[in-house]
Swiss-Prot record:
GO biological process, one term: uracil salvage
Gene: upp
Gene3D superfamilies reported in the protein's UniProt record: 3.40.50.2020
Cofactor notes: Binds 1 Mg(2+) ion per subunit. The magnesium is bound as Mg-PRPP.
Protein name per the record: Uracil phosphoribosyltransferase
NCBIfam families, alphabetized: PRK00129.1, upp
Protein's pathway: Pyrimidine metabolism; UMP biosynthesis via salvage pathway; UMP from uracil: step 1/1
TM regions (residue ranges): none
Protein family (similarity comment): Belongs to the UPRTase family.
Cited InterPro entries: PRibTrfase_dom, PRTase-like, Upp_B, UPRTase/APRTase, Ura_phspho_trans
Lineage: Bacteria, Pseudomonadati, Rhodothermota, Rhodothermia, Rhodothermales
Entries under Pfam families matching the protein: UPRTase
Residues where 5-phospho-alpha-D-ribose 1-diphosphate binds: 78, 103, 130-138, 199
Amino acid sequence: MENVTVVDHPLLKRDLTLLRREETPHGQFRKTVSDAAAILAYEAMRDIELEETSIETPLEQTTGYEIAEEVMVVPIMRAGLGMVDGFVRYVPEARVGHLGMQRDEETYRPVDYYSNIPSTIGHAHVFVVDPMLATGGSASFAIDHLKEEGGQDFTFACLVAAPEGVQKLREEHPDVPVVTAVLDRELDDNAFIRPGLGDAGDRIFGTRES
């Protein structure tokens, strides 16, 4: 699919297997989400801007590189919180915003309940993270909100995407690339991704028994 990167990596495939497995306990699930997010971050940040800098090694002067643009990570709460540590692992200076959203289980439409976004968003490359891209409603709504806050440069990163969600983002935000670990088959009648991995938020935080 255009503007979609499916990251092909053996460790990511291993992690996805753990995440899909119903009997994986929430502690291991939470750690695996973070580990998988770090692999996604490696790929999602491939085109991040660098600038040269002169440094001294123990032996001589040479040229090195520093990140030239501000990096911001905005998780769609609550499940997106599980991906933050993975994304800031390589860029500890990244700013982190928070956007609280939940899905209305009758209309399947997103409802926001919290927003705290750094004021520097207009100068940052913003990585919007959420484990699941299902209908695309929450992702599109979040990006709308962040653009209203002044954001201009975005990447959306998820662990599992449905074709319907990808299509919605392509239609409503064609300027936002999607990076995912896997593109699953479809949404079911309840707007859950199949085969999917269940409710990522519940499984990360252990808030509901299987």
